[in-house]
């Protein structure tokens, strides 16, 4: 089963019949329109390309405009691709949130919030050094980052200060709390990566 592209609206909570509060993330999933169907014969693999939402006409490039016209769909805010396995799709077909009606758990992929350049304590949860006992300048520095003349270098991949966030993150096996097809909403238990209004990809859980 393929996934869908949605927009993170924010977090709230819902209550069970027993009065238990469940924290949920609200994901708005408007109709995903099929813009291209890729086949094993023509492209070497089977997939569909989709778009969702809308885009101002003056923001659509000429190649994009031609691509959308060929598919017979309204220009969307982006293009995403999902691999297919035996499912049949047609150009211009709309796929809605109700495909998740019988799904118990989903994987959600998004772009995490960017935090800029951060130190080792925030980025990697390093312990801080002594606040006193003669330490006056090195409270939050990394400490030793290598060995000696041998190997005489810092190993690749060493955890150090650097850019944090703004990367693709997937949270797996989030429980589907509610599917509201009428309002085009999907409620999943817990947090999903990304800022409010950012695009997220929702797929049936791999490990469900």
Swiss-Prot record:
N5-methylglutamine modifications at: 149
Gene3D superfamilies: 3.30.160.810, Translation factors
Domain of life: Bacteria
Coiled coil: none
Gene Ontology BP term (one): translation
Function: One of the primary rRNA binding proteins, it binds directly near the 3'-end of the 23S rRNA, where it nucleates assembly of the 50S subunit.
Assembly description: Part of the 50S ribosomal subunit. Forms a cluster with proteins L14 and L19.
Name of protein: Large ribosomal subunit protein uL3
Species the sequence originates in: Actinobacillus pleuropneumoniae serotype 5b (strain L20)
Gene expressing this chain: rplC
